[in-house]
């Protein structure tokens, strides 16, 4: 791979690096929150997702090799939303969420990343960038399929999952 001679590929890898880095950081952050609330199955799952993001980040670094990637400012990233596609939304998380809900959140993130990579491939005029972006999309699709298989093994959520059973802690 010659990202230093291929600015389109270097730009793609810079986006991929940021996408995976942000996803990993967010999953690790969510794992810590779930662990603090003793929601250990969900914490463990979020840590697994953080490790997968770290593996993807290593793949990006390997593809880039010794070539420095463009250093983009936050507003120079071309994301479909405010944050990178694979970054879990804070609004979608609850400290009492079930493992099923965590998998559904991760599945939506994997599908968003898959779509992003497909769109990047479709929009690129560079053959090598299209090939690598399509490969990344296929990899995300594989992760999504694995999550879908795992979801089939989990029970449906109960109706009282988000009900608070603790009294609010208010100063007297």
Q: Where do the PLM segments sit?
A:
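Iron-associated oxidoreductase/ferritin-like identity signal
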Residues: 1-172
């Amino acid at each position: 791979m010659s990202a230093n001679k291929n600015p389109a590929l270097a730009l793609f890898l810079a986006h991929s690096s940021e996408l995976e880095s942000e996803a990993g950081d967010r999953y690790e952050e969510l794992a810590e929150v779930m662990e603090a609330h003793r929601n250990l199955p969900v914490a463990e799952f979020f840590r697994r997702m953080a490790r997968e993001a770290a593996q993807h980040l290593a793949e990006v670094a390997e593809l880039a090799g010794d070539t420095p990637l463009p250093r983009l400012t936050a507003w120079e990233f071309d994301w479909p939303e405010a944050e990178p596609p694979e970054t879990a939304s804070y609004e979608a998380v609850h400290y009492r969420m079930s493992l099923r809900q965590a998998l559904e959140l991760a599945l939506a993130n994997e599908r968003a990343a898959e779509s992003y990579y497909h769109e990047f491939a479709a929009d690129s005029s560079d053959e090598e960038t299209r090939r690598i972006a399509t490969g990344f999309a296929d990899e995300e699709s594989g992760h999504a399929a694995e999550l879908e298989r795992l979801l089939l093994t989990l029970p449906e959520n109960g109706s009282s999952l988000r009900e608070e059973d603790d009294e609010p802690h208010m100063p007297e």
